[in-house]
């Protein structure tokens, strides 16, 4: 079905799908599973690698040799773009919103290691930087390069179609595992992943609610972005995505103290997933989605007998940029023995939720 699209194979697919029995038991959920798009590889994996297969395929088809994209200082998308560009033999230019730090850590360090050319914009957020792409592309063309502009999050129709293909992959795995989730929970910001999943849900006849937990701004703003992408997908790829009326479900209750700000709920969610399942979340996206899963389960908003799938979108390298906050939280928790005791006693690991 998706073979008609240009594609440069990068990801290690299919990504694993497996149950989270320990976390499910702690939260009172009988059937909790996880889809591991943190394991797409290369570049430490993440959801953008799927998108970049189609984005780079399109860029190469157009004869481009340079990827230009935007993001925040600890952008997972930019890190994956830098890695994918290296693997595809292309140059990479990153426009990052924020002040250049004295020390590079986390994703920013990896951007540099992958050879990306980085430009910092101290007074701009990452989404407004999309408006700078055209002028940067013009400058690079004047230098003799053939640049390809990639908006934040690779949130384009062709990038989003990667997640329609991901739903096809998931449906095959669900059939083999005899698992039928009633809901799929996924973090969202720029909206490309969620738009693709909703399109794929329609294309594949997947009978599951897809809930995007917004980590960036209001549910209304996020819904507008997702709706716009879906309309563009229907318009630009009518042979793949027929016209339909999408059900866009976005919840903005779990943003916490703001985008890329890690508070106590995010720390606790990261610790719960790590100590009960050996799964690492990130502070910016999946940490907040994890908070949403935990709070909805504990409040009864997710019924105990309702099969639920948590879609992990990656982002763990950002943990190293938050090492001080995470270390302080661990130190407050006490000794290793005390922490082991805490995670073994019923109810203790959910304190604070």
Question: Each PLM stretch: what is its role?
Answer:
Residues 1-353:
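PLP-dependent amino-acid enzyme catalytic core
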């Amino acid at each position: 079905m998706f073979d008609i699209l240009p594609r440069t194979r990068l990801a290690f697919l299919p990504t694993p799908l497996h149950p989270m029995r320990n976390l499910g038991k702690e939260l009172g959920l009988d059937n909790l599973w996880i889809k591991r798009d943190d394991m797409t590889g290369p570049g430490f994996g993440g959801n953008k690698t799927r998108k970049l297969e189609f984005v780079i395929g399109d860029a190469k088809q157009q004869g481009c040799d340079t990827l230009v994209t935007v993001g925040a200082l600890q952008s997972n998308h930019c890190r994956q773009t830098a890695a994918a560009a290296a693997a595809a033999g292309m140059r990479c230019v990153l426009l990052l919103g924020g002040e250049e730090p004295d020390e590079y850590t986390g994703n920013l360090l990896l951007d540099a290691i992958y050879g990306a050319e980085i430009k910092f914009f101290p007074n701009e957020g990452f989404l407004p930087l999309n408006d700078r792409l055209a002028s940067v592309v013009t400058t690079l063309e004047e230098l003799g390069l053939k640049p390809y502009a990639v908006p934040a999050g690779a949130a384009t129709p062709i990038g989003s179609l990667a997640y329609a293909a991901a739903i096809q992959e998931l449906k095959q795995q669900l059939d083999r595992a005899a698992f039928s989730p009633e809901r799929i929970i996924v973090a969202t910001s720029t909206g490309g992943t969620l738009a693709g999943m909703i399109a794929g849900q329609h294309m594949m006849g997947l009978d599951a609610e897809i809930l995007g937990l917004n980590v960036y701004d209001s549910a209304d703003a996020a819904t507008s972005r997702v709706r716009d992408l879906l309309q563009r997908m229907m318009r630009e790829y009518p042979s793949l995505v027929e016209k339909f009326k999408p059900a866009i479900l976005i919840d903005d209750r779990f943003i916490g103290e703001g985008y890329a700000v890690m508070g106590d709920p995010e720390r606790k969610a990261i610790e719960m997933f790590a100590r009960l399942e050996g799964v690492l979340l990130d502070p910016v996206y999946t940490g907040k989605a994890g908070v949403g899963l935990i709070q909805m389960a504990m409040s009864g908003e997710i019924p105990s007998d309702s099969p639920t799938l948590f879609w992990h979108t990656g982002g763990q390298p950002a943990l190293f940029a938050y090492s001080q906050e995470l270390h302080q939280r661990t130190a407050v928790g006490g000794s290793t023995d005390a922490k082991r005791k805490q995670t073994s006693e019923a109810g203790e690991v959910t304190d604070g939720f």
